[in-house]
From Swiss-Prot:
This is Nucleotide-binding protein SH2124. GTP binds at residues 70-73. Displays ATPase and GTPase activities. It comes from the Bacteria. Signal peptide: none annotated. It comes from Staphylococcus haemolyticus (strain JCSC1435). The lineage of its organism: Bacteria, Bacillati, Bacillota, Bacilli, Bacillales. InterPro entries: P-loop_NTPase, RapZ-like, RapZ-like_N, RapZ_C. Keywords: ATP-binding, GTP-binding, Nucleotide-binding. Belongs to the RapZ-like family. GO terms for molecular function: ATP binding; GTP binding. ATP binds at residues 19-26. Coiled coil: none annotated. Pfam families: PapZ_C, RapZ-like_N.
Length: 304
């Protein structure tokens, strides 16, 4: 007899990629194609049910499909939420939605750099700012049903691709993953974080001349940060909290948890703590744990 788990594994998987224009949908689709997804760009929402019917016929090439949908569909886009809900109710295809967004200022910068017109401003009658704000309003409904919301404001193309690969490169969607990220408050808070912890109360290696050019990834800085009693107490209390909270997030159906650790510049204290937290979570949980240091190298002009 085929059990429930085997039935789930045999189902085709559909990932709908949508979000704000300029937030990175093209990058995501290209990356998904590289890791084995059958990708379709700008499919009119009205054709989505027909496409799903093809997936249900068992074609091996349509086992994992990613479809990018945006407001170029104009009036047709209004039906997208209803179309997705209808597909989910049929229970024949696993459907997930990824929504990409970025801060307005960043979107404006990207559009000016690319010199392309916004999809809502093809006739030139709207300002770029008004086009972006209207798009945010029009997409608000689809954002509410998204499984994955990714803020690309601070992400390079390389980092965005890494996020996509971390989540979708395996044969099946990963049921739950934890992303631990360090950042610097002076460079802006991490927008897509679920939990943010401020470690600026800990002794700062920045004021030790030999340690200043290093990061928390370097052993001397790591040991300096971790040697203090207050660091150890904080770490123990934080791990107790995370061990309590994380199973609850998973139980509620959350597929990804982003934990952000912030210090002043994102170079020393937050990096060391994020590193240790990631190692500890890997030991405790049978989940995929990823560690990312957003601002560790920004002082040298390189964001890795």
């Amino acid at each position: 007899m085929t059990n429930h788990k085997e039935n789930e594994m045999s189902k085709s998987e559909l990932l709908v990629v949508t979000g704000l224009s300029g937030a990175g949908k093209s990058v995501v689709i290209q990356c998904l194609e590289d890791i084995g997804y059958f990708c379709v760009d700008n499919l009119p929402p009205i054709l989505l049910p027909k496409f799903v019917e093809l997936m249900e016929q068992g074609n091996p090439s349509l086992q994992k499909v990613a479809i990018a949908i945006d407001l170029r569909g104009k009036e047709l886009f209004k039906s997208l939420v209803e179309e997705i809900d209808a597909i989910k109710s049929r229970n024949d295809v696993i459907v997930d939605v990824m929504f990409l967004e970025a801060e307005t200022e960043k979107l404006i910068s990207r559009y000016k750099e690319s010199r392309r017109a916004h999809p809502l401003n093809e006739n030139g009658q709207m300002s770029l700012m008004d086009s972006i704000l209207e798009e945010k309003q029009l997409l608000s409904n689809i954002r509410t049903i998204a499984n994955y919301i990714v803020d690309t404001t601070q992400l390079t193309t390389k980092e965005l691709k890494a996020r996509v690969k971390e989540k979708f490169e395996d044969e099946n969607f990963k049921s739950f993953s934890i992303n631990v990220s360090s950042f610097g408050f002076k460079h802006g808070i991490q927008k897509d974080a679920d939990l943010v912890f401020d470690v600026r109360f800990l002794p700062n290696p920045y004021y030790v001349e030999d340690l200043r050019p290093m990061t928390g990834e370097d052993e001397p800085v790591y040991h300096y940060v971790m040697k203090w009693k207050e660091t150890e107490i904080f770490f123990e209390k934080l791990m107790d909290l995370l061990k309590f909270m994380i199973p609850g997030y998973k139980k509620e159906g959350k597929s990804q948890l982003v934990i952000a650790i912030g210090c002043t510049g994102g170079q020393h204290r937050s990096v060391a703590l994020a590193k240790r937290i990631g190692e500890e979570l890997t030991e405790i949980f049978d989940y995929n744990v990823y560690v990312h240091h957003r601002d560790a190298h920004i002082e040298s002009g390189v964001r890795k």
